[in-house]
Amino acid sequence: MSIENLVEEIGKLTLTEAAALVKALEEKFGVSAAPVAVAAGVAAPAGDVAAVEEQTEFTVVLVAAGESKINVIKVVRSITGLGLKEAKDLVDGAPKNVKEAISKDEAEKIAKELKDAGASVEVK
């Protein structure tokens, strides 16, 4: 298989499948897909940076499934696009991240869905 064919096939993946591929590659090769930080030419004073920085990315963490585990699994599947087994494994392995690097509004919406299903949820 040529690199061009491989790129074409990867381009056909859904966003969820692509994220799973990245995670599998990170685990297999012991690397991270996070961008490498580049040193800035002129550093701003630390006080200014702290005042400007506001959290823009949030993570929804499933703390516990609660009593209605089946309902929580259904919600996790709809949120993540995972299969039944993967969603069940995520719920059984709580505390686990359900969604990462999302907006505050999306995090609150997902947390509400999970809480309505009976789960204990944390937004970080």
Curated annotation (Swiss-Prot):
Superkingdom of the organism of origin: Bacteria
One Pfam family, short name: Ribosomal_L12
A Gene Ontology molecular function term of the record: mRNA binding
Keywords: Ribonucleoprotein, Ribosomal protein
GO biological process, one term: translation
A single cellular component GO annotation: cytosolic large ribosomal subunit
Quaternary organization: Homodimer. Part of the ribosomal stalk of the 50S ribosomal subunit. Forms a multimeric L10(L12)X complex, where L10 forms an elongated spine to which 2 to 4 L12 dimers bind in a sequential fashion. Binds GTP-bound translation factors.
Annotated function: Forms part of the ribosomal stalk which helps the ribosome interact with GTP-bound translation factors. Is thus essential for accurate translation.
Family named by the database record: Belongs to the bacterial ribosomal protein bL12 family.
Protein name, UniProt field: Large ribosomal subunit protein bL12
Organism: Chlorobium chlorochromatii (strain CaD3)
